[in-house]
Amino acid sequence: MQLSSSLRSARSAAASSGCALASRPVVACRRVTPSVTRPGPFTIATGPLLPASRSKAGGGIRVFSSALYEFGQQLKEDLEHDLSRARVDAITNKTRIAELEQQRRILMAVGGMADDEPELKAALMQLEEILGVSFNELQLMLAETLADHPAKMDNLAAMAAVVGTGSDGGGDESGDRRTADAADADGDGDGGERAWLRFKADVRACLADLRNRKGGITLHRAIVKDMVSASSNPGARRSSSSVDKMAREELDRLMPFLLDDFLDNMPGLKAAFTGKAEPGAEGDDGEDEEEGEAQGVGEDAVDSSSGGSGGGGVLSCTAWQQVLGRTVPASSPTLALVLARGYLAMAPRQYRALALVRMILPGKTGGGVDGALTRKEGLSLLKKLRPGISGLADKDKQWLEWVIARLAAEFAVQPAGDGHEPEPKRPELPPTAVQREPPAEEQHKPTAGARDSPNM
């Protein structure tokens, strides 16, 4: 009895302790008796063993190959050798060019053939000083080539105008243009008056081309502001804010009126073309001085035999430099380049060449403003110079300018064709082919059956 009672008390104590353990949270049980898990089976990692920068195909992993190394070294040596030879050839060519230029100077000095046209480098320095533009070596070399071929240079300028404006380069058919053409056809009026009308028409055409360009409306609006502030006509007075609010159509209507007033009132500008003193000069001494200066220009102000801007002729270098000197200081910075483009067509060949080079090779200034070609327009010019050219989309700007310069130089020096498109080159014979000339008697008297001979 005593044994059974002790067993029952032990069971009750165990049951009570079991209930207490069962009522505890699972976490407490795990703390008391943590479970031991067995490790899983061995697996191979599927992720990259190398960092992301080196896990790509061939990234940072180099396999040494003696044949590949020798080939790379040989290719590097060949490229360095070709580059050195190209530099030597360039130095040789520049030396030869300097010698030929010196011989030409001596020949012109001895033969009395010197004229008033400056060398191209002197014209370049003048444009850089007055207009604030700059030229690199590539532009200078192309301008020198174009200046020696004025006819082909004008053809190239017409091609560039077509791709730049999308038109035939006719510009604005203003009343001045029609008056100048009529005077040329009838033979009326002197060369100075025709040159003055031609100049005004060319400036109008340049402003019309500027309006059609991307971003040209901003420069167009700035030019209108400058001419409004400089105008002495009360009817042309406009505030700067009112010009900012003008639409394109209103600017187009206001521009011709302002331009005529601006050009007519510019001191000494018309006299540089016509060679006649302007009425209303202040003081007798000033009038005599102005008249003498104008007469000095008017003696040879227009050289109609030099080509250029049509019947109006090309201004002599002295007259054109006076136009340049009088126009730029009196105009605004934005209008200066536009006016310069207007009479660059009437300028001597050196200035026309520099203007054309600035148009087709804009350099760091980009394109789309002041007549400079954009990249898309440059590609169009390349296709005109070389119709079969391809693979130009992925080329950079510097490569594009080099190709344009080379093809433009080739276009200038090649024989005259149709005046607009370069003549196709004759196919070159393969290196193994040998071209033989038949005897003189065979050239004039072919033998019988020669057409059927397999050797002919």
From Swiss-Prot:
Keywords, sorted A to Z: Signal
Ranges annotated as biased composition (Basic and acidic residues): 418-428
Keyword Heme attached: no
Gene that encodes it: Ezy-1
The name this protein goes by in its record: Ezy-1 protein
Signal peptide: 1-28
Keyword Zinc attributed: no
UniProt region (Disordered), positions on chain: 167-189, 273-310, 414-456
Biased composition (Acidic residues): 281-293
Organism this protein belongs to: Chlamydomonas reinhardtii
